Regions:
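ABC ATPase NBD coupling module
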Residues: 63, 76-91, 108, 116, ...
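C-terminal boundary and immediately downstream tail of ABC-type ATPase nucleotide-binding domains
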Residues: 135, 232-262
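A short, surface-exposed alpha-helical micro-motif characterized by mixed small hydrophobic
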Residues: 209-211
Length: 262
């Protein structure tokens, strides 16, 4: 179990006299992620969803500080411990495709991710992994500058699948993808969850979240406003704000009904 307990993230602000003060961005955030489940972290822009993922991996910018506790299987993790877990126990799929090294081919980047986790990094296996994301094996010879944004997103998702991490922290993983590719990618995440990985997925897309996630955690004004199963949201439970958001979606109208994903 990966647990965030009373996590607070604050940003440093300086007056013209150089005095520093701290402004809270996230306050008293508590949530749990179990192996085998997908939890969708939803909320508007600027709510701090990405910062919460970064805090788990000690990737916060220098002008931010974190309070509270992040634990793995009941054991609190210090900054150094969380840093050591990156890439194998905790895998991060960032929002920006700039995370790909512009000087390395796709093959070298995927191969490195596989080797760091003790996995087979043969060209054949890497090519098979790309095909699962509807990318030709020839993509292995490409550099990031030769990829579209959607292709780069799928390459980043491949790194998570290759590593076999216990917990995957995915930030806006479906950004820049059309619905067909977004559903393909989320279906692959569901397969990883079915094999035992816990997935914390940041998204703005509540409709996709309800289709693919097991639970919804909603942030509003820097705090957790809702924690509930997707089933309960469909039944009309949750805060007034979350229910209004859900009922405003085209998917809520029977004319645009979308099948549930099991």
């Amino acid at each position: 179990m990966l647990s965030f307990d009373h996590v607070t993230i604050e940003a440093a602000h300086y007056s013209w006299l150089g005095r520093r003060s701290w402004q809270p961005l996230l306050t008293d955030i508590s949530l749990q992620l179990a192996p085998g489940e997908i939890v969708a972290l939803v909320g508007g822009s600027g709510e701090g969803k990405s910062l919460l993922l970064q805090s788990a991996l000690t990737l916060l910018p220098d002008n931010l500080r974190m309070g509270g506790t992040i634990s793995l299987d009941g054991t609190p993790l210090c900054d150094a411990s969380r840093a050591r877990l990156r890439g194998h126990t905790l895998c991060y799929v960032p929002q920006g495709v700039s995370a790909l090294n512009p000087l390395l081919t796709v093959e070298r980047q995927l191969g490195r991710a596989a080797r760091l986790c003790g996995q087979n990094a043969s060209r054949e296996r890497l090519g098979e992994q790309l095909l699962r994301y509807q990318l030709p094996a020839a993509t292995l010879d490409s550099y990031p500058r030769q990829l579209s944004g959607g292709m780069a997103k799928r390459i980043l998702a491949c790194t998570a699948a290759l590593g076999g991490a216990r917990y995957i922290l995915a930030d806006e993983i479906t950004a820049w993808l059309d619905e067909e590719l977004a559903c393909l990618l989320l279906g692959q995440l569901r397969e990883l969850a079915n094999r035992g990985s816990g997935i914390l997925w940041v998204t703005h897309d509540l409709a996709l979240a309800v289709r693919f996630a097991d639970r919804i955690v909603a942030l509003h004004q820097g705090k957790v406003s809702d924690t509930l199963s997707c089933h309960h949201l469909r039944q009309g439970q949750g805060s007034e704000m979350l229910r209004a958001h859900w009922q405003a979606l085209p998917e809520f109208n029977s004319l645009f009904s979308v099948p549930e994903v099991s």
